[in-house]
């Protein structure tokens, strides 16, 4: 209805219209959280790291990957976490046995350099480097999983997990996942003693890594509900 040129109505029709408007507003209010949640990125894969610090078990980190939003980046991480490509063939390299070489408290923990271990190495499953896929997802807070790089289109295998919101990294680093379980382990890693270059004094290693099944929910009609995380 054009409010600048109101349409003549009877009292009864006005009451009916008011009721409809009130009902519409109420429905929108009730459904709005669900709509926002439904727009969250779909988690297509779950992978885990079993972490050791100084040779002693520290705990497990479970991460969800956004394979619908950034399929190429998510598959790179999944393959490196499992050591197998999408066909189940061994890569001959990957994250297992590698270390977290850079820890900065109130910022992030960084790993993924399985060739040199100092932040200068690593490689992707697509070759040495691959381009930035997109910057649709943002660094919204603790637990965000994002690609480390040396500038535009230089993604390899190195990644970081945020321990705080890092909005200044938006549109510069590709977000591709989120920690689902084990943030206590991440915070424990964040607080270890470090030396020059933010390197842990005692090594933090990925003792084991792999993929976990996703348990999908089912709606009232028996349809599988996508596994999402609300950002």
From Swiss-Prot:
InterPro entries, sorted: Cyclophilin-like_dom_sf (IPR029000), Cyclophilin-type_PPIase_CS (IPR020892), Cyclophilin-type_PPIase_dom (IPR002130)
Taxonomic superkingdom: Eukaryota
Glycosylation, residue list: 155
EC number: 5.2.1.8
Pfam families: Pro_isomerase (PF00160)
Motif mapping: Prevents secretion from ER: 228-231
UniProt-recorded name of the protein: Peptidyl-prolyl cis-trans isomerase B
Main location: endoplasmic reticulum
Reaction equation(s) it catalyzes: [protein]-peptidylproline (omega=180) = [protein]-peptidylproline (omega=0)
Protein purpose: PPIases accelerate the folding of proteins. It catalyzes the cis-trans isomerization of proline imidic peptide bonds in oligopeptides.
Provenance organism: Cryptococcus neoformans var. neoformans serotype D (strain B-3501A) (Filobasidiella neoformans)
GO cellular component terms listed in the entry, alphabetical order: endoplasmic reticulum lumen; fungal-type vacuole
One MF annotation (Gene Ontology) recorded for this entry: peptidyl-prolyl cis-trans isomerase activity
Entry similarity comment: Belongs to the cyclophilin-type PPIase family. PPIase B subfamily.
Annotated PPIase cyclophilin-type domain residues: 48-211
Keywords attached to this entry: Endoplasmic reticulum, Glycoprotein, Isomerase, Rotamase, Signal
Gene Ontology terms describing biological process: protein folding
Regulation of protein activity: Inhibited by cyclosporin A (CsA).
Signal sequence annotation: 1-35
UniProt subcellular location: Endoplasmic reticulum lumen
């Amino acid at each position: 209805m054009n409010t600048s040129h109101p349409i003549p109505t009877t009292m009864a029709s006005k009451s009916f219209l008011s009721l409809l408007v009130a009902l519409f507003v109420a429905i929108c209010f009730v459904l709005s959280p669900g709509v926002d949640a439904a727009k969250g990125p779909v988690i297509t894969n779950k992978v885990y790291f079993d972490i050791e610090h100084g040779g002693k078990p520290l705990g497990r980190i479970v991460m969800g990957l956004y394979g619908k939003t950034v399929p190429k980046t998510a598959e790179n991480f999944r393959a490196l976490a499992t050591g197998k490509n999408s066909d189940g063939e061994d890569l001959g390299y990957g994250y297992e046995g590698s270390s977290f070489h850079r820890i900065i408290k109130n910022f992030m923990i960084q790993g993924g350099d399985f060739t040199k271990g100092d932040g200068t190495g690593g490689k992707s499953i697509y070759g040495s480097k691959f381009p930035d896929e997109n910057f649709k997802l943002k660094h919204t807070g603790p637990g965000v999983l994002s690609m480390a790089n040396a500038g535009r289109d230089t993604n390899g295998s190195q990644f970081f997990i945020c321990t705080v919101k890092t909005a200044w990294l938006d549109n510069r680093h590709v977000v591709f996942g989120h920690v689902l379980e084990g943030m206590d382990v991440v915070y424990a890693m964040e607080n270890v003693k470090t030396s020059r270059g933010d390197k842990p004094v005692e090594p933090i290693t990925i003792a084991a890594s792999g993929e976990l099944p996703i348990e999908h929910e089912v709606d009232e009609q028996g349809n599988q509900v996508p596994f999402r995380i609300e950002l």
